[in-house]
Amino acid sequence: MDEFHRYGKEDNSRQQCFLYPLFFQEDLYAISHDHYLDGSSSSEPMEHLSSNDQFSFLTVKRLIGQIRQQNHSIVLFVNCAPNPLADCKKSSYSESVLEGLTLVLEVPFSIRSKYSVEGMNEWKSFRSIHSIFPFLEDKFPHSNYISDARIPYSIHPEILVRTFRRLIRDAPSLHPLRSVLYEYRNSPENLQRSIIVVPRVNTRFFLFLWNYYVYECESILFSLLKRSSHSRSVAHRPFPQRTHFHRKIKHIIIFSRRNSLKSIWLLKDPKINYVRYGERSIIAIKGTHLLVKKCRYYLLLFRQCYFHLWSEPYRVCSHQLSKNCSSSPGYFLRVRMNPLFVRTKMLDELFIADLITNEFDPIVPIVPILGLLAREKFCDVSGRPISKLSWTNLTDDDILNRFDQIWRNLFHYYSGSFGRDGLYRIKYILSLSCAKTLACKHKSTIRVVRKELGPELFQKSFSKEREFDSLPFSSKAAARSQRERIWHSDIPQINPLVNSWQKIQDLKIENLFDQ
């Protein structure tokens, strides 16, 4: 792989990343085949791999020769298999060639990212979900407006190719990418006739498309936000000298006082903070309502002009934090006023001052979680636990482990929220639903199941003090656990209930705009 990077660097100095000859290198497909085997071995056992999936580099050489002859055999990237006995969708040939295409396209972006990271001191880029919660606690209390924006994930394949063309000047190297995208677009499984760039399938190709697409969206957006933070009077044009900037602001303030006092606040530098998780992004702004409306307008206009996408208005929602709650990522997020009483002593005199601070307050969405539990057949609409009939064919340990995993995911994910008392209602529903599922499996009652299996099985999974076993709490500190927030380190394993609840919230917002 280092040789490909060196080859890309040499071509970058001569012909702006001339990558087309890399497609005919046999070593490239050997590397991609190893990556394909590593990915398949981690997802499925070796005994599931049939003998028909044997890989032959002689066949790859023949395919390379056919590509050189340009007899339209490029369609093998998606749905063609040289071995008729092998499954078309799981063919190692198509996957390996697709991996090779991804490796070639990653060469210029890896070189570009090496030099772009050096200039990212002003905009700190975090790549972990753990950075979201410090961001919310640090930036949300100092913001008064929030914009919840969703990245459009359905895009025309030709737009993706044009965005690649801005970096890769080698036009022939983009022909295989265009063929793959159009082949996927015209496949019978794709009913929307567009490219879904969200990596629903964990393949290297779709992950690369998603990362590149998000990078293009955020890189241009960051430059607009940086320019807009210098001045609101000149759109996206920073002042060359700071002295002229202060003089112009002073002149505008004197002029605006004759008309309206509210226009003075439009000239102050706004504080704009940005965070993204998945396809949802949050822009926290400290400014006026007119500034938030302009940011929302610029964001919609940016997507339409840069990516030629019509972005629905409900994809960018703006509201005030002190009056409304946001619903991302899986929380009810709000900022509340917290009066703080501080006493200071100076010169033997006691001065008492009341300080009012803003406090970030994530709320556990108990009612939506109950609705999702009813949707997944753990309880009815009123919250009464019922048996999970689809799990009755599992063993007792599997049933207990599944219920236990759901509870641990819920508790750990909402461990940093205030008012976690409602979670114990969820715990009661899950424990009783687990007991009813075991009773339904053994065709007995809950009392008989407890006598036969013993209460220790339930205590193993639903113990009262289990959630505090791993926390460094003393006996006195345990009483203050409801007022303290601890974000667990295993929250990246987000439970599917949170994602399902977020989809329901999106549908509600869409219905409001459709009316």
From Swiss-Prot:
Keywords: Chloroplast, mRNA processing, Plastid, RNA-binding, tRNA processing. InterPro entries: Domain_X, Maturase_MatK, Maturase_MatK_N. GO terms for cellular component: chloroplast. The keyword Transcription does not apply. It comes from the Eukaryota. Belongs to the intron maturase 2 family. MatK subfamily. This is Maturase K.
